[in-house]
Amino acid sequence: MDALEICNKLRSEASGVATSGIPLDVFPQKMQQMILDLARTENYSVEFTATSLISAMAAAVGNSCYIRIKGNWITSPILYVILVGRPGVGKTPPLNFAYKPLHDIDTEEHHKFKALKNEYAAIVERNKGKKRTEWESLPPVPVLHKNIMNDFTPEILMRNHDVNLRGVAVVVDEIMGLFNTINRYNNSSFVQQMLSAHNGLPVDVSRCNLDCPLRIDYPCIQIVGTIQTGIVHELYDMGFKKNGFLDRFLITYPKGLKIAPWVKVPKQDAAIIERPFRVWKEIIDKAVALPFTEGIFNVLDFSDEAIDIFYDWQNEDIERQNAITDEKMIDSRAAKVPLNTARLALIFQLFRWACDESHKDFVDAESVNAAIRMSDYFEKSYKRMDDLVLTEATDPVKKQVLDSLGNKFVTAEAVKAGADFGFARRTVMYMLKDFCQRNFIIKDKQGNYEKVQK
């Protein structure tokens, strides 16, 4: 254990990181120091920062690297992420920090694009009135390459991805705006496109306003944004849990996080303030420099030890799923966990390579263990969010009615339980319908109900 590792361990213990549940120790030592520095100097939440860094690294890597899950099943690090928290707890600043190096690259690209566009327009202007034989040769039509998008229509998103086949990131402060956009375009199959994109399947876009239909054979779209606890239930109300879209998201929802008091940083610690920005830029720059060529796949395999760990972990979950005899009780989210976890393993391997702690020849056991622990954290966060929807978005008394019933019950039992709390039969029937729509309970053809096990 070197000096930095000891220092990080002591700082983590002093900061109470262990009580948060996030496995900060799975990150490279250089990144642990950076995350703890930001918590001290910028009041950033350790959990929001760590998650934002994972998302930004995935965006920087894009389609330049793949991981082989098994056989011919390979995937690039496509991650959909939501940061959940009450207003004012600082969800956005860590996200802005993580994506700043990519924002800076986009700013540079925009300046280059404007210069090339002006040059192109000037040549066109000079050619006016000249004979064709006297024309100056025109350079290729300038095209703007963007890594990050925050305001778009489905067509613009896919057009940009068609230009930047390495990948694009949808980074939005309030993610409800994105979900509202998706909901608005539901009839045009945008939801299905985003589901396919997360699976790494080809995405086709055919619109009457497109000169040529678009086809992205190997999509790599990152989605990340924040949401306030008070409106999380709207994601469920809009049907994003039911259609499986929400199942694909990694959730970070810190336990009992409150607004941190501002603390004055001594002047002698100025170097600490600057260090995280320098270190993170170096890491992202290494990831961005990874070569990408359309149609050529740089695939990292698991090491023998890593694949044993990954498969044993997955097979344990398969056993749990197979033990469920009632298909209605199977959680659809469970099927997405191994894919996201494999992608996390790839990211952690590249984190360690970028921090000079490892290589990028294959994904080793340490990265797989890191991914499994991080995946477990995300699933526990999701469970907290799920519980939040039930408790915050539901009338407390109505929740008590549901809690008073067994895991399986019939309408008559629900009506009786509702009457005990002063609800009329009609109100109870509306209540049951609402619980079904929120996927809290399931109703079979015989009119029997069963609680969904979270």
Predicted regions and their residues:
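Phosphate-handling catalytic cores of nucleic-acid transaction enzymes
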Residues: 1-454
